[in-house]
Structure formats: structure tokens, C-alpha cells
């Protein structure tokens, strides 16, 4: 298992709130919590940037982190990530912040310590552009946006 440096910026983490951990041996994501001082009412259509109380330094250029929504918040309450997916580069060392957006019709209260997103560590391949005049023909060609059908 890879090791990633993490700084605890909020003393409640590891005390009142558990450290992020994988729930099962098959879990891909680590839950991130809202390190708030008081409950936050998120009105319909409102976005807020929430602190997680953690800073990470992945360091390995072959890795990055993705911050993804928790399925229950979006499906049951309409609360999703404001930027849909967050990308944490390997050389970033600041606090992890989570943008949340209430796309639902009702106000939603986020409690201090509530799990608001999940972080997944993913491999990264950097590519270099090779400028060409034409591509080698493929079966698909330039077909996109529904080109392959629905069924």
C-alpha cells in the first residue's frame, strides 16, 4: 500500500472525527469530512467551499487524487460537488477543500464532521503531443456524442 503524507490541520481529526480510512478491503475511496465550527445550511442553488482539516502531499508524480461525490448525498438530497470532480496534483501541499452545491429543491444542513466527499488515489500518465497532419483511419472516425447508439 502506498504511503501519502498528510497534515492534520484541525485538531478534531483523530479525536472527535476519525482519520480518513477505507471502510472495507474493497473500498476505493477515503471519506472526507466537513471541518465546520457550526452547522451550515445550504440553500437550494447555493455553493460553499468547505474545509476538510487535512493537507496532503502525494509527492509521487505517478499518482494524483480525485475528490468525488458521495452517492447518497447527491441521490437523496441533491447535494453534489460544485466542480463535479476535484483533482489534486501530486505536488499540491495545501488544505483539501471541497466545493459543495445544493442542486436540490430543499435546504440541506451540513453538520460539523459530516462526510461530504470521498478521495480516490489514481495513477497518472503524462503525455506529450505529437503534431500530425492526419490520423490513421479507425472504425469510429470522428463520430461522437451518441454515435454508437443507445442499445
Swiss-Prot record:
- Listed as disulfide-bonded, the cysteine pairs are none
List the Pfam families.
dUTPase
**Enzyme superclass (EC):** hydrolase
* Cofactors (names): Mg(2+)
What is the catalytic activity of this protein? Answer: dUTP + H2O = dUMP + diphosphate + H(+)
| UniProt key word Phosphoprotein | no
The pathway that the record names for this protein is: Pyrimidine metabolism; dUMP biosynthesis; dUMP from dCTP (dUTP route): step 2/2
Sites binding substrate sit at 70-72, 83, 87-89, 97
Gene3D superfamilies in alphabetical order: 2.70.40.10
The protein's job, in short, is:
This enzyme is involved in nucleotide metabolism: it produces dUMP, the immediate precursor of thymidine nucleotides and it decreases the intracellular concentration of dUTP so that uracil cannot be incorporated into DNA.
What family is reported? Belongs to the dUTPase family.
Put simply, this protein is called: Deoxyuridine 5'-triphosphate nucleotidohydrolase
- Organism equals Proteus mirabilis (strain HI4320)
Amino acid at each position: 500500500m502506498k504511503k501519502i503524507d498528510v497534515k492534520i490541520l484541525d485538531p478534531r481529526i483523530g479525536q472527535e472525527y476519525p482519520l480518513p480510512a477505507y471502510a472495507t478491503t474493497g473500498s476505493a475511496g477515503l471519506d472526507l469530512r466537513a471541518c465546520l465550527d457550526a452547522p451550515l445550511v445550504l440553500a437550494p442553488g447555493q455553493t460553499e467551499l468547505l474545509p476538510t482539516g487535512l493537507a496532503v502531499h502525494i509527492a509521487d508524480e505517478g499518482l494524483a487524487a480525485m475528490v468525488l461525490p458521495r452517492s447518497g448525498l447527491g441521490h437523496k438530497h441533491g447535494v453534489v460537488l460544485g466542480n463535479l470532480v476535484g483533482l489534486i496534483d501530486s505536488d499540491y501541499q495545501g488544505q483539501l477543500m471541497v466545493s459543495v452545491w445544493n442542486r436540490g429543491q430543499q435546504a440541506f444542513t451540513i453538520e460539523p464532521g459530516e462526510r461530504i466527499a470521498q478521495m480516490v488515489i489514481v495513477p497518472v500518465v503524462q503525455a506529450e503531443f505529437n503534431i500530425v497532419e492526419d490520423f490513421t483511419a479507425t472504425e469510429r472516425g470522428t463520430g461522437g456524442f451518441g454515435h454508437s447508439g443507445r442499445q
